[in-house]
Amino acid sequence: MDYSDPAELRESYDGAPLDPRGLAPQPMDQFHAWFTEACEAELSEPNAMVLSTVDPDGAPSARTVLLKGYDRRGLRFFTNYRSRKGVALAREPRACVVFPWHAIRRQVIVYGFAERLSDEENDAYFAQRPHGSQLGAWASEYQSAPVADRAELDRAYARCAEQWPPGTPVPRPEYWGGFLLVPQEVEFWQGRSDRMHDRFRYRLVSGTPSEGAWQIDRLSP
C-alpha cells in the first residue's frame, strides 16, 4: 500500500447497532456509559478531547486537552488562562470538543458554552496535581507565547524547582484554572458498515442541561 496517498487508506467499521431505545434521556448520562466503556476497552487516554475555539479575529483553532471531570452540568478541563484557548474562551465562550474513540468505532461531539470554574474548584484540583506539573504551570507563565529556545524553558523550570522543592506546597498561579463546558448539543456517533453510521443528536430545548428537556434526533450518516 502507498501510505503517501491518504485516499488509499480505508477502514471497515463493524460497530454494533446503536438502538435509540437504549439511549439515556440525558446526554451526560449517555456520555458516562460510553466513557466507562472506552476506559474498560483500555483505550490510550480516553479522556483526551479535541477542543475547538474561536479567536478574537474569528479564526478557529483546535488542540487536544484532557477531560478532568464531568457530571450532568458539563465537562471540566484545566489550562493557562493566558493561553490561546484561555484568551479565546474569555472573549467567545462558545466551543466544542470531540472525543475520537477510533479503536471502538465511536465519537462524541459536545457543543456548548465555557464557564470559568470557581477559585475553590481550581485550588482543589491544582493541589492534586503532581509536583512537577505544578512547577510547570509556573514555568510556562505565558503559555502559547514564543520563547527563544528550550534552554529558556528549562531555566524557568529550574527557578521554580528551587523556589518550591519537593515536599513544599505549591500555590496555584492566578492565571491557571479550569473551565466547565456547559452542553447545548451532544452527538453520539457509532461506526457501521458501508459508511451507514448511526448518529444521534441531543439538543437542549428547555431548562438547564442538568435537569432540562433534551430532544433526541437520528441524523443521516
From Swiss-Prot:
GO BP annotations listed: pyridoxine biosynthetic process
GO molecular function terms noted in the UniProt entry: FMN binding; pyridoxamine phosphate oxidase activity
Pathway(s) the chain acts in: Cofactor metabolism; pyridoxal 5'-phosphate salvage; pyridoxal 5'-phosphate from pyridoxamine 5'-phosphate: step 1/1; Cofactor metabolism; pyridoxal 5'-phosphate salvage; pyridoxal 5'-phosphate from pyridoxine 5'-phosphate: step 1/1
Key words of the record: Flavoprotein, FMN, Oxidoreductase, Pyridoxine biosynthesis
InterPro entries to which the protein is assigned, alphabetical: Pyridox_Oxase, Pyridox_Oxase_CS, Pyridox_Oxase_N, Pyridoxamine_oxidase_dimer_C, Split_barrel_FMN-bd
Reactions that this protein is recorded to catalyse: pyridoxamine 5'-phosphate + O2 + H2O = pyridoxal 5'-phosphate + H2O2 + NH4(+); pyridoxine 5'-phosphate + O2 = pyridoxal 5'-phosphate + H2O2
Sequence positions that bind substrate: R10, E11, S12, Y13, K68, Y125, R129, S133, R195, M196, H197
Cofactor(s) recorded in Swiss-Prot or TrEMBL: FMN
Cofactor descriptive note: Binds 1 FMN per subunit.
Entry similarity comment: Belongs to the pyridoxamine 5'-phosphate oxidase family.
Function: Catalyzes the oxidation of either pyridoxine 5'-phosphate (PNP) or pyridoxamine 5'-phosphate (PMP) into pyridoxal 5'-phosphate (PLP).
Name the record gives this protein: Pyridoxine/pyridoxamine 5'-phosphate oxidase
Gene name in the database record: pdxH
